[in-house]
Amino acid sequence: MKAELIAVGTEILTGQIVNTNAQFLSEKMAELGIDVYFQTAVGDNEERLLSVIDIASQRSDLVILCGGLGPTDDDLTKQTLAKYLGKALVFDEQAGQKLDAFFAHRKQAARTPNNQRQAQLIEGSIALQNQTGLAVGGLITVDRVTYVVLPGPPSELKPMVKNELVPLLSASHASLYSRVLRFFGIGESQLVTALEDLIKHQTDPTIAPYAKTGEVTLRLSTKADNQALADERLNRLEAQLLSIRTVDNQPLRRLLYGYGEDNSLARETFELLKRSGKTITAAESLTAGLFQAQLTDFAGASQVFNGGFITYSIEEKARMLGIPLGELQRHGVVSSFTAEQMAAQARCLTNSDIGIGLTGVAGPEALEGQPAGTVFIGLATKNKVESLKVVIGGRSRLDVRYIAALYAFNMVRKTLLKSENLL
């Protein structure tokens, strides 16, 4: 099945907004086994939109239009598609009731006749209800081409696609099953080199690498009749690729940290801390609280985290953590000594099981003779204090700080796994 995406809105063409909907929709279509062959952006102009719809209908089986469902005169997507299909617009009662409820609770908002446009639907369409907005979407098939209209705001489009559109399309198309593997400690080029033969000769299942900031993911995908058959194929491919070694002779299995599109090193570490009943603290310099902020993104963070420290200057490291100022000056702020002392003192002061210390040079200038990107991470438990030095070269200040936090999470993750004899 060939799909085409049409983004409607002059603001896209003028660069005022980025069309993130195209990426989201392409991913969702791929999960359904639907191939997106074309993506188009067109302004709020009926003549040009009619032309784009006509071209799409001649070469695609599924045409998805995003945007232009609002109440103003330049919101003309449904009106233009209805004109192209020779269909009338009808009023959707459920969407109309939502309009009534919205304005009933907002006396200060004046309802105008134009608002009725948001509850209109092309005659013969299946309504796609809007859980987070007012404009109803729709799906209609005419002459073997299926047309879908969706709202433009991602906060409205995404729930509509997940909860309304995907179930409809899933019922009529073969499914694509995917599994996302997440790796840390290896770059995309190194990973692709290690998997060169597998990628070169892939058919089904397929392997798709994606570079993220500081990490790499692999999406394994297969088209199958059911989940059990898909799992069998994906398990076989996963076992094969995880047994492969990198150019420096590391098994890829050791670099895999988790699964899932929305997973992260922070989440994996948080779950391990919860499972083991351990608590953690951190004293941060160059990351300025980033490690602690990511850790507390998850509900239940208070079970594993009581508090921590941001000690940016050398004086605050001495004052807040009780590290002798003379020792800090002698060893330098950017050093294994300082990272280890930060971790150990933070652990003792908060009575935590694990302490992390982060210090380094975010850049762009060097510090204490250390180049930008030099990071020392200390880790303290009741039994040991250790540190790791990493050099995150060629990155922005923001990336250095973010990747430094990733290394810290990975250090904690590996420590917890070793304590459970799982690494």
Swiss-Prot record:
Pfam families under this entry? CinA (PF02464), CinA_KH (PF18146), MoCF_biosynth (PF00994)
Q: Which residues form a coiled coil?
A: none
Cleavable signal peptide: none
Q: Which family does it belong to?
A: Belongs to the CinA family.
Q: Which HAMAP family match?
A: CinA_B (MF_00226_B)
Q: What is this protein called?
A: Putative competence-damage inducible protein
Q: What is the lineage of its organism?
A: Bacteria, Bacillati, Bacillota, Bacilli, Lactobacillales
- Whichever gene encodes this chain, its name is cinA
